[in-house]
């Protein structure tokens, strides 16, 4: 009898334990943060997402959801490249043996904070899939001190080479380069960083940012890739035709990009270097002649449109995921009847999983500006009065310091069937219309930018021609003899920066007061 009672008690305890574990797991699962992850590529969401292209009044053609989701997913961790002599002991050996590891593991993420931290990893580690290379020549160059020093490259304070990444795969260790963080991190003189802020090219920056570009350029050429996160491997045509297919605007009879067809590699490199003085990169469908500075991602959650020319709506987190996918591996070159690619051009055959893009977007939404060192003193208070008096708030409306509306590019007459989604101020501030009218990213509009964070952003106006607030409010910038602090056309020492003349009539004292106020935002 005692034996039967003991067995019964043991079974009862086992059942109780199992029930307790089940209840505990159920409770933990009920407390788990379960995000509602939208589909990145959704045909219904894509239908009215883009703004029609100026001069054609048609939206760019996007690949279908079926084609997008047929791309294989890529979910690999990457590791920093250390400057020779700064690599930790055993690091290279570790890379040879660690094997491929997942960039994001959704099943391990139980809180919103976990997802945001996973998004930071995507932001920092996700690489440009089209630039990943196993070529031993490039891998050796990335580990060769003399080769790096010939490019004037220097390590960051932690000993790493900015933007370069190692990728352990099933085929060995590849060299690649950062995707998001290459452009959307600003380094301060002390080596600290502002995630989400655009890099500067006229202020202190990682000494190895652009001097190290020769290695990236060599990889791009070897893989038949145009700069600016191109989602394609170009065909067998000469480099000039690659450029035309990346940037040409055939529906414009005065298309400046026609001249690219005969460019040599050296001519391309010269023009590309000049365009980078804007604080930006000529993205696919953008322009080497009408550059766009890298935008600030801090505060993007409150922005209604994406890109300087409002190429796409920002209606929800799904749109930010969609845009990240678009510019990384899903862009096209089809505009109505105009199909820009050659028959032997190949799309990058990879994409990030939806979970990675969702985590990335969450992280970007979470970004905060650094502590503002500028005091709200009497000078700044006087500047706030001037800001209100001059009517600046009509466009740069507090608290976001943007109305989230669009202004007309100089000379643009909107069509009669403007989509209802566009909130347009029927005014033009007179800035250079090239990006908005002469490129495939041209919509005819410029969005009103937020003034929040102008103290750290640097490079003003959409083309980054203005390098400081002092230059922005200097009446002399309107003169042909002006020497821009930022972008200027190739081989031009002087260049007038027209448009947005608000505040130029103020006297010197009032200008300084207004600038002091703007720096507190």
How does the language model describe each region?
Residues 2-13:
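Bacterial N-terminal signal peptides that target proteins for export
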Residues 14-21:
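Bacterial N-terminal signal peptides
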Residues 28-521:
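Periplasmic c-type cytochrome electron-transfer domains
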């Amino acid at each position: 009898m005692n034996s039967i009672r003991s067995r019964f008690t043991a079974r009862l305890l086992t059942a109780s334990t199992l029930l307790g574990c089940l209840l505990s797991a159920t409770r933990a699962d009920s407390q788990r943060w379960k995000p509602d992850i939208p589909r990145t590529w959704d045909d219904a969401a894509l239908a009215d997402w883009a703004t029609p292209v100026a001069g054609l009044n048609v939206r760019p053609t996007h690949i279908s959801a079926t084609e997008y989701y047929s791309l294989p997913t890529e979910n690999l961790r990457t590791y920093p490249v250390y400057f020779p002599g700064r690599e930790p002991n055993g690091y290279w050996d570790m890379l040879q043996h660690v094997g491929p590891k997942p960039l994001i593991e959704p099943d391990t993420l139980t809180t919103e904070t976990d997802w945001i931290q996973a998004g930071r990893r995507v932001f920092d580690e996700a690489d440009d899939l089209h630039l990943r290379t196993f070529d031993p020549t490039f891998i050796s160059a990335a580990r060769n001190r003399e080769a790096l020093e010939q490019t004037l490259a220097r390590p960051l304070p932690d000993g790493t080479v900015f933007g370069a990444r190692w990728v352990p795969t099933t085929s060995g260790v590849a060299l690649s380069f950062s995707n998001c963080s290459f452009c959307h991190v600003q380094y301060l003189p002390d080596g600290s960083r502002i995630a989400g802020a655009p890099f500067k090219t006229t202020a202190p920056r990682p000494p190895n940012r652009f001097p190290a570009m020769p290695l990236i350029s060599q990889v791009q050429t070897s893989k038949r890739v145009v700069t600016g996160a191109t989602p394609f491997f170009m065909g067998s045509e000469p480099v000039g035709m690659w450029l035309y297919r990346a940037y040409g605007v055939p529906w414009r009879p005065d298309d400046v990009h026609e001249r690219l067809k005969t460019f040599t590699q050296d001519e391309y490199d010269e023009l590309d270097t000049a365009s980078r003085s804007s604080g930006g990169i000529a993205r696919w469908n953008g322009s080497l002649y009408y550059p766009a500075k890298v935008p600030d991602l801090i505060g993007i959650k409150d922005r209604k449109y994406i890109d300087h020319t409002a190429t796409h709506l920002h209606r929800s987190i799904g749109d930010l995921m969609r845009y990240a996918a678009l510019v990384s591996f899903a862009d096209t070159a089809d505009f109505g009847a105009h199909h820009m690619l050659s028959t032997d051009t190949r799309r990058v055959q990879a994409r990030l999983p939806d979970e990675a893009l969702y985590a990335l977007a969450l992280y970007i939404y979470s970004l905060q500006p650094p502590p503002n060192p500028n005091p709200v003193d009497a000078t700044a208070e006087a500047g706030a009065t001037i800001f209100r008096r001059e009517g600046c708030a009509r466009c740069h409306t507090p608290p976001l310091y943007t109305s989230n509306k669009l202004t007309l590019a100089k000379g643009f007459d909107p069509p009669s069937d403007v989509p209802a989604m566009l909130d347009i101020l029927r005014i033009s501030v007179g800035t250079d219309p090239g990006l908005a009218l002469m490129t495939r990213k041209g919509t005819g509009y410029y969005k009103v930018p937020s003034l929040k964070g102008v103290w750290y952003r640097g490079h003003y106006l959409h083309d980054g021609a203005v390098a400081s607030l002092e230059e922005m409010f200097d009446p002399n910038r309107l003169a042909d003899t002006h020497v821009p602090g930022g972008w200027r056309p190739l081989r031009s020492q002087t260049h007038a920066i027209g448009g947005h003349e608000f505040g130029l009539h103020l006297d010197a004292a009032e200008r300084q007061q207004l600038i002091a106020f703007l720096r507190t935002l």
